[in-house]
Amino acid sequence: MTDQTTRLPIRRALISVSDKTGILEFARELQQLGVEILSTGGTYKLLKDNGVNAVEVADYTGFAEMMDGRVKTLHPKIHGGILGRRGTDDAIMNEHGIKPIDLVAVNLYPFEATISKPGCDLPTAIENIDIGGPTMVRSAAKNHKDVAIVVNASDYAGVVEGLKAGGLTYAQRFDLMLKAFEHTAAYDGMIANYMGTIDQSKESLSTEDRSEFPRTFNSQFVKAQEMRYGENPHQSAAFYVEAKKGEASISTAIQLQGKELSFNNVADTDAALECVKSFVKPACVIVKHANPCGVAVVPEDEGGIRKAYDLAYATDTESAFGGIIAFNRELDGETAKAIVERQFVEVIIAPKISQAAREVVAAKQNVRLLECGEWPAERAAGWDFKRVNGGLLVQSRDIGMITADDLKIVTKRAPTEQEIHDLVFAWKVAKFVKSNAIVYAKNRQTIGVGAGQMSRVNSARIAAIKAEHAGLQVQGAVMASDAFFPFRDGIDNAAKVGISAVIQPGGSMRDAEVIAAADEAGIAMVFTGMRHFRH
């Protein structure tokens, strides 16, 4: 068993980095600690120009860089110095004049940045595939018992602190080793993804006509949290987040108070937050079992999120119990007070939490309070995954949005301006309701949500039942459907309860019958040409 506390002194370091963030300060600290520094190319020049004593690798090996820099560190005096086992390989190292290298600070050619540039061609991409860097990283990681490998600038300070304490412990070197293998795995995965999208049948191997989906799919996620259990108590679970942070989301949120997030908390909070992001004006979304059970939008001058919460809650007070509440504005103290005095809530999430709100919610220590930060108006593209037995379904994120200008009026009666506002609102909500999804809305408030039924007309019936149970007036409300109506019965049912306007994708073989049903009832109907199935 390796002693976790034994400290490894550093006498010689090799530094060769593409990302030079913090490297000058790090090298100066090493120099002050008496560490001999070997370096290459641009890194050597940077150190030398700034007064840091370093030996160029070419001078140390006696072998100049060649092939336009393709071969720099691939030499026995480098890799023997890194891979040599102290106490085992000392004699052979001495015989060949190989000095031990105790620390390697390396990061790799910016392959991702290169291929992200417009017009990047395959030869350019290939020249930015690092060979010597990953080789040194893997060598040092393999021999982490005797060598420290540093691939992240964020680790420089910790390494210096350890050296000042007498050296790096095995536990520190093990952690650095793990980061190194994670780093090279992500790098190789990125290259494989890129190369796997190129059409090899084309002589030019142009990068302009690449497939959207690589031959093998490589993506890296980092464990953020181990959970007590999964969706059910007999299942184990953990929460992994993307290695590269994106827009504000459940994965970037900071928990300010409350019990540890559960598997279901994370899934439901994601659904609530992604839904509330759809709205520009102040909005509140309440979610239960990944379905919105209440949503409302209220302009600032009409009450903002405080009023929006009241309206969202009024949609379905029973389902809101133990739900998740998301806002697209800073949570203020007054709104927080209304929540904790009115209902039991699992999670509250907002881009920002005011100090007053924190103090109010602090009285309910079990409530999980999350601050996720602001998000851009334009949603970022990305991938969605669905695991099936033995496989993985991968698709682009559903970031499709519509505005009033995109609507196609298909009935004799055109919707009024207020109906259009409500139709667009209901459509945004329907996108986040499990299919078959039906949403009734009025004055930018949901008044009934029918979710997850095998029959679309049954979802419509449930939405009407929900509205009646909540004491909300359906007469004059609008209806949104996430997919087309295969038969006229959905419209006939809507007419019976007083729906005045309908929004749906269109595209059914029986669109003409459905439109006729709407005309017979005096219902205005618009097509979006876009479906929002959610399974």
From Swiss-Prot:
Pathway the protein contributes to: Purine metabolism; IMP biosynthesis via de novo pathway; 5-formamido-1-(5-phospho-D-ribosyl)imidazole-4-carboxamide from 5-amino-1-(5-phospho-D-ribosyl)imidazole-4-carboxamide (10-formyl THF route): step 1/1; Purine metabolism; IMP biosynthesis via de novo pathway; IMP from 5-formamido-1-(5-phospho-D-ribosyl)imidazole-4-carboxamide: step 1/1
One MF annotation (Gene Ontology) recorded for this entry: IMP cyclohydrolase activity
Domain of life per record: Bacteria
Pfam family, one: MGS
Keywords annotated in UniProt: Hydrolase, Multifunctional enzyme, Purine biosynthesis, Transferase
EC numbers: 2.1.2.3, 3.5.4.10
Catalysed reactions, as listed in the record: (6R)-10-formyltetrahydrofolate + 5-amino-1-(5-phospho-beta-D-ribosyl)imidazole-4-carboxamide = 5-formamido-1-(5-phospho-D-ribosyl)imidazole-4-carboxamide + (6S)-5,6,7,8-tetrahydrofolate; IMP + H2O = 5-formamido-1-(5-phospho-D-ribosyl)imidazole-4-carboxamide
GO biological process, one term: 'de novo' IMP biosynthetic process
Presence of keyword Hydrolase: yes
GO CC terms in record: cytosol
Family annotation (SMART domains): AICARFT_IMPCHas, MGS
Domain MGS-like: from-to ranges: 6-151
Cross-referenced InterPro entries: AICAR_Tfase_dup_dom_sf (IPR024051), Cytidine_deaminase-like (IPR016193), MGS-like_dom (IPR011607), MGS-like_dom_sf (IPR036914), PurH-like (IPR002695)
Family: Belongs to the PurH family.
Domain remark from Swiss-Prot or TrEMBL: The IMP cyclohydrolase activity resides in the N-terminal region.
Protein name: Bifunctional purine biosynthesis protein PurH
